[in-house]
Amino acid sequence: MGTFSIWHWLIVLLVVVVVFGTKKLRNIGTDLGSAVKGFKDGMKDAATDTAPAGQVANQSTADQTIDVQTKPKG
């Protein structure tokens, strides 16, 4: 029960091909590949387009002053 032999994996592969068919498996592979590529491109774009978080916070509060009064609880 520890490891699976090559025969086990071949039977599993055969069952998957019979259940889904080769065309459906090809479509799933294509969709998965395009999703991974899109994720990698998005991560690359996000890394180059954004500034560090400290700089963003300082820029947004440096331009404006906020004056707030608090009400005592009573």
Curated annotation (Swiss-Prot):
GO biological process: protein transport by the Tat complex
Main subcellular location: membrane
Keyword presence, Cell membrane: yes
Superkingdom classification of source: Bacteria
Annotated transmembrane regions: 1-21
Pfam families recorded: TatA_B_E (PF02416)
Entry GO terms, CC: TAT protein transport complex
Compartments where found: Cell inner membrane
GO molecular function: protein transmembrane transporter activity
Region (Disordered), start-end ranges: 50-74
Membrane topology annotation: Single-pass membrane protein
Disulphide bridges: none
Compositional bias annotation for Polar residues: 56-68
Alphabetically ordered keywords of this record: Cell inner membrane, Cell membrane, Membrane, Protein transport, Translocation, Transmembrane, Transmembrane helix, Transport
PANTHER family: SEC-INDEPENDENT PROTEIN TRANSLOCASE PROTEIN TATA
Stated family: Belongs to the TatA/E family.
Quaternary structure and interacting proteins, as annotated: The Tat system comprises two distinct complexes: a TatABC complex, containing multiple copies of TatA, TatB and TatC subunits, and a separate TatA complex, containing only TatA subunits. Substrates initially bind to the TatABC complex, which probably triggers association of the separate TatA complex to form the active translocon.
Function: Part of the twin-arginine translocation (Tat) system that transports large folded proteins containing a characteristic twin-arginine motif in their signal peptide across membranes. TatA could form the protein-conducting channel of the Tat system.
HAMAP family, sorted: TatA_E
Protein name per Swiss-Prot or TrEMBL: Sec-independent protein translocase protein TatA
Source species: Verminephrobacter eiseniae (strain EF01-2)
Underlying gene: tatA
